[in-house]
Regions:
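Short beta-strand segments
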Residues: 15, 92, 121, 146-152, ...
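Short acidic, glycine/serine/threonine-rich loops at helix termini
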Residues: 23, 100-102, 132, 157-162, ...
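Acidic-glycine-rich active-site phosphate/pyrophosphate-binding loop
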Residues: 39-48, 98-112, 150-163, 226-233, ...
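Flexible, glycine-rich active-site loops centered on histidine and acidic residues
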Residues: 139-178
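Claisen-condensing/thiolase-fold acyl-transfer catalytic domains that form or cleave C-C bonds
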Residues: 65, 69-72, 95-96, 106-139, ...
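Short glycine-rich phosphate-binding loop at a beta-alpha junction
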Residues: 84-92, 270-278
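Condensing-enzyme catalytic core mediating Claisen C-C bond formation in acyl metabolism
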Residues: 1-60, 163-248, 256, 351
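Short glycine-aspartate micro-motif
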Residues: 8-10, 88, 144-148, 332-335
Length: 351
């Protein structure tokens, strides 16, 4: 475990972009059946297992970078900033436009930025790790203002034609996924000091972050195409996952890091306005919250209407909570990320 006592960077702006095209779960099941001669699934199965009713789908002309850029343009406008005001761009996403160059370059070009850029990738924890990198660089005074963006395009990796139930089961995660983008502007906080007590209103910004991983479980879920292992294999271009093994992997990982982080910061869950937890399905959100001791009334339900947005899930939930009046300036919020590989992370933030 690694906990960073920070307070040196704050969230100056947050925006999310959800493509307008929607695909409900009935239509997903119908497309699977139409694309898979001789294969049938019980009607309503996906909804019953996941609780997901709808998800967003990017346009054929859009790329992952476009989703990030849409959100980034909104956050710069809302903060009254121009391209020269950004010191660093971090593209932090499980998705990418291509292997080379880094998608951060493509996003920067579309935004008209001329600052340094980098990609950060760690499955569904990519955005949370992007915040970690940005916060650390701001704390080191290398950069004063960092734009962290993500664009997730999982709809491009869904297997629609399945020959049998085993293939359907291993491809199941793709049927929960959704496209979207998000952007957070982090900047040095003038109102906080590194030694401010987290419980003090003066402790503004990112107060602490912690991450753990059990990388022995990496084969449980993969999208293997595009690397040296499967450079040209079309079969490797789809999501594959063993749901039961993934559940066991997260049980092995545990959630002690969450309690340890709160203890280090002298906080408990009741101190928070909301707790945003990465949501792969509605049932697993409830199971994880119960095991982690997170009160249900602090959660931000999102997966039912928006699907599994990968690394966009956490910023989307925070945006929903802000827009819905559930949190605001001075409030404590927690971002709890889970990701394939497997890893678990938490960021504690005072808005």
């Amino acid at each position: 475990m690694h906990t960073v006592m920070s307070g040196r960077s704050r969230i100056a702006g947050l925006e999310v972009y959800v493509p307008p095209a929607r695909l409900d779960t009935d239509a997903v099941e119908q497309r699977i059946v139409e694309s898979s001669p001789g294969f049938r699934i019980p009607k309503g199965l996906i909804s019953r297992v996941t609780g997901i009713r709808s998800r967003s789908v990017m346009a054929e002309s859009e790329q992952a970078s476009d989703l990030a850029v849409n959100a980034a343009a909104k956050v710069l406008a809302s903060c009254g900033l121009q391209a020269p005001d950004v010191d660093l761009l971090v593209f932090a996403s499980a998705s990418q436009d291509m292997v080379e160059p880094a998608t951060a370059h493509i996003a920067a070009a579309k935004l008209g930025l001329s600052c340094p850029v980098m990609d950060v990738k760690n499955a569904c924890n990519s955005f949370l790790n992007g915040l970690e990198v940005a916060d650390s660089l701001i704390a080191s005074r290398r950069y004063g203002r960092v734009l962290v963006v993500t664009g997730e395009s999982p709809s491009r990796a869904v297997r629609w034609s399945v020959p049998d139930f085993a293939t359907f089961a291993s491809s199941f995660p793709g049927y929960t996924m959704s496209d979207g983008g998000a952007a957070v502007l982090l900047e040095a906080s003038e109102g906080a000091t590194a030694d401010s007590e987290p419980s003090s209103p003066a402790a503004e910004g990112i107060l602490g972050m912690a991450f753990i991983a059990k990388s022995i479980h990496w084969p449980v879920g993969t999208l293997a195409a595009g690397g040296s292992a499967f450079p040209r294999d079309p079969e490797a271009s789809y999501f594959t996952m063993d749901g039961e093994k993934l559940k066991d992997a997260f049980l092995d990982l545990g959630s002690d890091v969450l309690g340890e982080t709160l203890e280090a910061l002298k906080l408990n869950w009741q101190d928070f306005a909301v707790v945003c937890v990465h949501q792969v399905s509605a049932p697993y959100r409830e199971i994880f919250a119960e095991r982690a001791g997170v009160p249900r009334d602090l959660l931000v339900p999102a997966v039912e209407e928006f699907g599994n947005l990968a690394s966009v899930s956490l910023p989307l939930q925070l945006k929903l909570a802000l827009d819905g009046g559930r949190c605001g300036p001075g409030d404590l919020v927690a971002l709890v990320g889970l990701a394939g590989g497997v890893s678990l992370g938490i960021a504690v933030v005072r808005l």
